From Swiss-Prot:
Pfam families: Cys_Met_Meta_PP. This is Cystathionine gamma-synthase. Optimum temperature is 45 degrees Celsius. It comes from Helicobacter pylori (Campylobacter pylori). Its EC number is 2.5.1.48. CGS from H.pylori is an attractive target for antibiotics discovery since the four natural inhibitors alpha-lapachone, 9-hydroxy-alpha-lapachone, Paulownin, and Yangambin also display strong antibacterial activity in vitro, highly inhibiting the growth of H.pylori, whereas no antibacterial activity against E.coli in vitro. These inhibitors might thus be used as potential lead compounds for further research in the discovery of anti-H.pylori agents. Belongs to the trans-sulfuration enzymes family.
Amino acid sequence: MHMQTKLIHGGISEDATTGAVSVPIYQTSTYRQDAIGHHKGYEYSRSGNPTRFALEELIADLEGGVKGFAFASGLAGIHAVFSLLQSGDHVLLGDDVYGGTFRLFNKVLVKNGLSCTIIDTSDLSQIKKAIKPNTKALYLETPSNPLLKITDLAQCASVAKDHGLLTIVDNTFATPYYQNPLLLGADIVVHSGTKYLGGHSDVVAGLVTTNNEALAQEIAFFQNAIGGVLGPQDSWLLQRGIKTLGLRMQAHQKNALCVAEFLEKHPKVERVYYPGLPTHPNYELAKKQMRGFSGMLSFTLKNDSEATPFVESLKLFILGESLGGVESLVGVPAFMTHACIPKTQREAAGIRDGLVRLSVGIEHEQDLLEDLEQAFAKIS
């Protein structure tokens, strides 16, 4: 089945009881039991809810997993995945990993005895060099946030398996429409469903899936034990958003490429980070392992100090956190999404104060270009 069709008909696409084409919102906290220990598959909505279950089946279907899990946020899902590890374990993290993931690991999980080494995961030699006897997991973003680095998933997964490591991939930027890490050797895939999957800036959610039954059982335990589950209303919203993911991603990519090409030629821009440009260092790899390049891009201005006045002059591009909605968003990672990363470490990774990140929406491309141009006109 083609992905475009699977987005609509995958998972549980209708209600088994009534035949409703839209899975109903089961707004309930508990369920009647026939007798003690005998129920119809659901006993308490933290442990399971039919609306959430339909979403979980859908993400597993889209990513090629055996089971999916829906959480109250992307970070709640990532926390559950890292709960698979034990005190004393070591993890490899990307040097431009999302700031929230960095904060979770370095402010919370370290207190539980976990440690990490920050590396450029797009460089396989750095991965091999950083592996220690107690390394248990390799955590990847590809494309990465915010520098849009592309990591060779098949090669990394192969190295990880040789060393007995879990390969965990944040697939938020690419979405299942453009990339399926499990099919390339990864063990676990995580998503911020808040972003492209929801697509309308109206829901906060996290999704996890794996193609390993044993891992699925462990994640299911942590999902229930920790309790950061997604509610039925948000589960329904996310399923509705996913139905149009294909159409939206095509529009996001079309506009992003147009914007990237415009920026690459602009005299006030120093560098553009977009894997859909032939000038991107991993362009050929992106073409090989992805079916498209998504709608995220970043660029640096020639004068770092102009980033703030530039983004504050934009009108259609909304200055705000998050990404992946139908509307275009702009941010300065150094002061927003990645502000929790120490400045020296941030700059060493290439996240300068003058780096601007765009989540290119699905507006008319000419309006977006004109908005960018008028903002450029207001800086030196």
